[in-house]
Amino acid sequence: MAYRGQAQKVQKVMVQPINLIFRYLQNRSRIQVWLYEQVNMRIEGCIIGFDEYMNLVLDDAEEIHSKTKSRKQLGRIMLKGDNITLLQSVSN
C-alpha cells in the first residue's frame, strides 16, 4: 500500500529537556524559574550544576516577588526539581 508524499521525508528534531538545561549551563545564561504552587514568587540565577532529577544548583540566585517586585539575594542555592514548573532564559 503506497501513501502519498512518501518520497518526501520530514525529519523531526526533538530537544531533550536535559540538553536545554545543559545549554543554559554551558552558555552561563541567567534563567528564571517558576515555582510549583508559588505563583507570586520566581527564582533567578545562573545554573552551575544539575542532575537527572532536575535538581539545580544556581549561583547569584535571587528570589523575586511578583506583586511587590522586591528582590532578595540568596547567593548559591540548590533548588529541588520537584519545585520547578518552568525554566526560561532572561536577559541581564
From Swiss-Prot:
One of its GO terms (cellular component) is U2-type catalytic step 2 spliceosome. GO terms for molecular function: RNA binding. CDD domains: Sm_E. Keywords: Cytoplasm, mRNA processing, mRNA splicing, Nucleus, Ribonucleoprotein, RNA-binding, Spliceosome. It comes from the Eukaryota. InterPro entries: LSM_dom_sf, Sm, Sm_dom_euk/arc, snRNP-E. SUPFAM superfamilies: Sm-like ribonucleoproteins. One of its GO terms (biological process) is mRNA splicing, via spliceosome. Its main location: cytoplasm. Signal peptide: none annotated. It is found in: Cytoplasm, Cytosol; Nucleus. Residues 18-92 form the Sm domain. Belongs to the snRNP Sm proteins family. Plays a role in pre-mRNA splicing as a core component of the spliceosomal U1, U2, U4 and U5 small nuclear ribonucleoproteins (snRNPs), the building blocks of the spliceosome. Component of both the pre-catalytic spliceosome B complex and activated spliceosome C complexes. As a component of the minor spliceosome, involved in the splicing of U12-type introns in pre-mRNAs. As part of the U7 snRNP it is involved in histone 3'-end processing. Core component of the spliceosomal U1, U2, U4 and U5 small nuclear ribonucleoproteins (snRNPs), the building blocks of the spliceosome. Most spliceosomal snRNPs contain a common set of Sm proteins, SNRPB, SNRPD1, SNRPD2, SNRPD3, SNRPE, SNRPF and SNRPG that assemble in a heptameric protein ring on the Sm site of the small nuclear RNA to form the core snRNP. Component of the U1 snRNP. The U1 snRNP is composed of the U1 snRNA and the 7 core Sm proteins SNRPB, SNRPD1, SNRPD2, SNRPD3, SNRPE, SNRPF and SNRPG, and at least three U1 snRNP-specific proteins SNRNP70/U1-70K, SNRPA/U1-A and SNRPC/U1-C. This is Small nuclear ribonucleoprotein E. It comes from Sus scrofa (Pig). The gene is SNRPE.
